[in-house]
Regions:
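Hydrophobic, membrane-embedded alpha-helices of multi-pass small-molecule transporters
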Residues: 7-27, 46, 100-104, 108, ...
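Hydrophobic alpha-helical segments and their helix-loop junctions in multi-pass secondary transporters
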Residues: 24, 101, 127, 138, ...
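Membrane-water interface regions at transmembrane-helix termini and the short interhelical loops
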Residues: 34, 113-122, 135-157, 227-230, ...
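Selective recognition of specific alpha-helical transmembrane segments in multi-pass small-molecule
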Residues: 46-60, 108, 159-171, 211-214, ...
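Hydrophobic transmembrane alpha-helices that form the core helical bundles
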Residues: 60-81, 87-124, 283-311, 335-345, ...
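Extracellular loop-to-transmembrane helix junctions
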Residues: 7-8, 34-62, 235-250, 343-356
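Transmembrane alpha-helical segments of multi-pass small-molecule transport proteins
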Residues: 10-20, 45-52, 94-101, 121-145, ...
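Flexible loop linkers connecting adjacent transmembrane helices
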Residues: 30-40, 61-88, 259-277, 308
Length: 370
């Protein structure tokens, strides 16, 4: 008898993956600029590389989490790294486990920075207000644990991607007359002084770095979701999210390059695109950006806190509050654009190292099962 699939569950997992992926960097389009659009005509190369990494790694996380019935998502690192011997595996796994938790927490700080920049650029609010409001909402959600997080993310994700597509499709069309000349200008390096770029001019390295930093976001999250739910539903939902995420990224690149004269130097390029449509759309989209920041900030803080405390305990709640407040304070003193470039770029390359362990483990497991 065939195992049935649940359409609602698939859409829920798809929405959760979209929500987790589309945080401050994507919703503001700052990471799209740095990883993809800054490569001009070669942006599609970076997108394809990142998409391949996204699909393979997330299938592996969910499948192995389910197969091994992992109780804690972070244990997935020990599984992959143990393929090179117990002693080395334990050391490498411990490094990735703690480092990924720290990276997820620092990515939460990036989200706070994104909230600050959005609130300041669109509404003229003082630096700190956006981060404080975000932190209050995130702490309140994380305290409810993984089930509460999934419930929240699955509902908000589709709304965010629809609004991003709405703005990017319209501005991609209005920017078409300038696309060719702007693309040539970006290719010629005329915007290198204002457009930060990951990969040092290599779109393959940029795509690898982009896929790499997302690995460290999704590893524990999807391994635990895979362990607790029907694997087929999780994997189909994740694959569906790939189409929406990277399809949206491609359209965003066309829109950003088509209007590169106003987007290149902006902290929040997405707002500049929305303003090309109308001020009202910009106001609405600023709220959507905040929602995107929130949906990524929640599981990022959860992953960091979950590493050092058990969900539901008093200690877990206290650490959630303290870590949230500390991240908010840090974000108020470090520029947002610099946070995205340095933190995401460096950790992307480290995440890519994990892929090597994953490939070796998955091949070995596949061969031993024959």
């Amino acid at each position: 008898m065939k195992k049935s699939i649940s359409i609602l569950a698939i859409l829920g997992f798809c929405g959760a993956c979209i929500s987790f992926y589309i945080g401050a960097g994507f919703a503001t389009m700052q990471e799209v600029v740095q990883y993809e659009a800054s490569y001009g005509s070669l942006f599609i190369v970076a997108i394809i590389v990142a998409a391949i990494i996204y699909v393979y790694t997330n299938l592996s996380f969910a499948t192995n989490g389910n197969r091994l019935n992992l109780k804690r998502g972070g244990d997935i690192y020990g599984i992959y790294c143990g393929v090179f011997g117990q002693k080395f595996g334990n050391l490498a796994a411990k490094f990735f486990d703690y480092f990924s938790a720290l990276f997820c927490y620092m990515s939460f700080v990036v989200m706070c920075g994104g909230a600050n920049s959005t609130a300041s650029q669109q509404w003229g609010l003082p630096i700190g207000v956006g981060a404080i409001l975000l932190t209050i909402l995130v702490i309140s959600t994380v305290i409810f644990g993984l089930d509460g997080i999934l419930n929240t993310l699955s509902k908000i994700g589709p709304i965010i991607i629809i609004m991003i597509l709405f703005v990017s499709i319209i501005t991609a069309i209005t920017g078409l007359p300038s696309l060719s000349s702007n693309m040539a200008s970006v290719d010629a390096g005329n915007y290198t002084n204002v457009m930060k770029q990951v990969g040092n001019g290599n779109p393959i390295a940029s795509g690898a770095s982009y896929g790499g930093f997302v690995i460290l976001w999704f590893a524990a999250f999807l391994a635990e979701i895979g362990a607790k739910n029907k694997l087929k539903d999780v994997n189909i939902g994740m694959l569906l999210s790939t189409f929406f995420i990277f399809g949206a990224a491609s359209i965003c690149c066309i829109a950003l390059i088509g209007h590169v004269d106003v987007t290149a130097a902006s902290d929040i390029p997405a707002l500049e695109l929305a303003k090309q449509i109308s001020p009202i759309v910009a106001q609405i989209f600023a709220i959507v950006i905040c929602a995107g920041i929130y949906t990524s900030a929640v599981p990022l803080l959860w992953t960091g806190v979950r590493k050092i405390s058990h969900e539901g305990t008093k200690e877990y709640k206290l650490i959630t509050i303290v870590a949230g407040i500390l991240g908010c304070i840090i974000a108020c003193f470090i520029p947002y654009k610099g946070l995205v470039n340095v933190l995401y770029g460096l950790n992307g390359y480290l995440g890519f190292i994990l892929i090597f362990f994953m490939i070796v483990y998955d091949i070995k497991t596949k061969m031993s099962s024959k």
